[in-house]
Amino acid sequence: MAANDSSNAIDIDGNLDSDSNLNTDGDEATDNDSSKALVTIPAPAVCLFRFAGDAAGGAVMGSIFGYGSGLFKKKGFKGSFADAGQSAKTFAVLSGVHSLVVCLLKQIRGKDDAINVGVAGCCTGLALSFPGAPQALLQSCLTFGAFSFILEGLNKRQTALAHSVSLRHQTGLFQDHHRALPLSLALPIPEEIKGAFSSFCKSLAKPRKF
């Protein structure tokens, strides 16, 4: 009898172990399937998608601007399409190249500062002036890079200033909310001053005799 009980216990333990192994294998298979279902996009692909979206948006805005500029110059509805195409190309390069370089530098350097924007501006100037003389390329790179760097620095400074002002305002509201008793309650006015002030008000209220 004892041998039979021990053999039954061993069989039950073996079944439990096999069930747990099957459950573990099933969980691992489910995790693998879910990991395969979730497609992770690497950083360069994200930058490329951002480049495509910004370039398309810039092309749309440039075409609208160029077509309106052609109408303003009285080139007619058909003659304005040339200006629309040229402006669309320029705006697409401006938006797309700038966004792509900023995204790549952010992934490489791990920072989001004015240096990234300045380098992106330089690359944008090179793309707009290409092909051209080396002097024109250098001038365009320096112009766009310096302009982008200065604008980004001013934008960062303005954002920091606005944040500090909001913090001061919140601190002032907190102090006003937790302020002690008002001055009129903390320092009561003496009765003599109250009587003199009331008599003065009554004298002003009396009608004058002419």
Swiss-Prot record:
- MF (Gene Ontology): protein homodimerization activity
- Taxonomically, the superkingdom here is Eukaryota
Q: What subcellular locations does the record give?
A: Plastid, Chloroplast outer membrane
Where do the record's region annotations for Disordered lie?
Answer: 1-34
Q: Which residues cross the membrane?
A: 37-53, 88-105, 114-130, 137-154
Result of knocking out the encoding gene: Impaired import of CEQORH in chloroplast inner membranes.
> Which keywords does this Swiss-Prot/TrEMBL entry list?
Chloroplast, Membrane, Plastid, Plastid outer membrane, Protein transport, Transmembrane, Transmembrane helix, Transport
Subunit and partners:
Homodimer. Probable component of a protein-conducting channel made of HP30-1, HP30-2 and HP20 that mediates the import of transit sequence-less proteins into the chloroplastic inner membrane. Interacts with CEQORH.
Describe the family membership recorded for this protein in Swiss-Prot or TrEMBL: Belongs to the Tim17/Tim22/Tim23 family.
Q: What does this protein do?
A: Together with HP30-1 and HP30-2, triggers the import and insertion of transit sequence-less multi-pass transmembrane proteins (e.g. CEQORH) into the chloroplastic inner membrane.
Name used for this protein in its record: Chloroplastic import inner membrane translocase subunit TIM22-2
Q: Which organism is it from?
A: Arabidopsis thaliana
Gene name, per UniProt, is: TIM22-2
